[in-house]
């Protein structure tokens, strides 16, 4: 099952009181591929994302990264190991510039307590931050405060902040939430470019976007894995069409 998986979830379950959000979820995420997690509302996508990203402790099962059991490790330790994430809700420093936000993230990698050291004490960080901002399309917005960026630009900045930790694995939770169609196209093109050099796991509810850029797709339903495979395999899966797409062939066509 695992092959050259960089991350695996093994028999993961999660309960909240009497409610079972995840049940025996086992998924292997291939190294160097873009894997998307989809499913209808209430499928358990966000809960699963929070478990594999270290924000939630599973009630059962474990999460393994590069052969190491990382279940229960702090998010700081996960970042040190090479896992970075970006959530639906931005967590930027709104009054700091785009460059300062990314520079601080890069500085935090150098030392756990080094976020506020003088910039001069950590040579090269400004250049590194500038390069990351250019990579995500914000090379002309270095001096703009995060609060002054458009929503799509803020999401791109979030991704640059995540990349500042030099991750082996990038986890993205609904990066297009609240975006205009133009912003959505831009951010998905960015993610597709990033995935050519990194392993990316993407939670996204927009089927068309997922099918167009993913190498593999995992479908969750009622907290369980309903199906997984290539986009074409998911399009052709009758169970997926029944519980998620809802309208058979026309819905699959729209997902292309």
Which stretches of residues belong to each language-model region?
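Glycine-rich phosphate-binding loops of nucleotide-dependent enzymes
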Residues: 2-256
């Amino acid at each position: 099952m695992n092959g050259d998986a960089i991350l695996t979830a093994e028999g993961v379950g999660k309960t909240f009181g009497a409610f079972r959000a995840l049940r025996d979820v086992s998924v292997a995420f291939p190294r160097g591929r873009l894997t998307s997690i989809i499913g209808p509302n209430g499928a358990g996508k966000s809960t699963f994302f929070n478990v594999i990203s270290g924000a939630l402790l599973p009630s059962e099962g474990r999460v393994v990264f590069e052969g190491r059991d990382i279940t229960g490790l702090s998010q700081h330790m996960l970042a040190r190991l090479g896992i970075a994430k970006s959530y639906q809700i931005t967590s930027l420093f709104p009054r700091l510039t785009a460059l300062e936000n990314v520079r601080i993230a890069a500085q935090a990698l150098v030392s756990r307590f080094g976020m506020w050291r003088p910039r001069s004490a950590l040579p090269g960080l400004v250049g590194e931050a500038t390069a990351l901002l250019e990579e995500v399309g914000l090379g002309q917005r270095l001096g703009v405060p995060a609060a002054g960026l458009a929503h799509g630009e803020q999401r791109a900045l979030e991704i640059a902040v995540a990349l500042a930790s030099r991750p082996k694995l990038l986890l993205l939770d609904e990066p297009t939430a609240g975006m205009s169609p133009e912003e959505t196209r831009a951010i998905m093109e960015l993610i597709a470019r990033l995935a050519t050099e990194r392993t990316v796991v993407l939670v996204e509810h927009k089927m068309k976007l997922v099918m167009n850029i993913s190498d593999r797709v995992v479908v969750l339903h009622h907290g369980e894995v309903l199906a997984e495979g290539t986009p074409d395999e998911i399009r052709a899966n009758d169970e997926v069409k029944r519980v998620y797409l809802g309208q058979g062939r026309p819905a699959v066509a729209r997902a292309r």
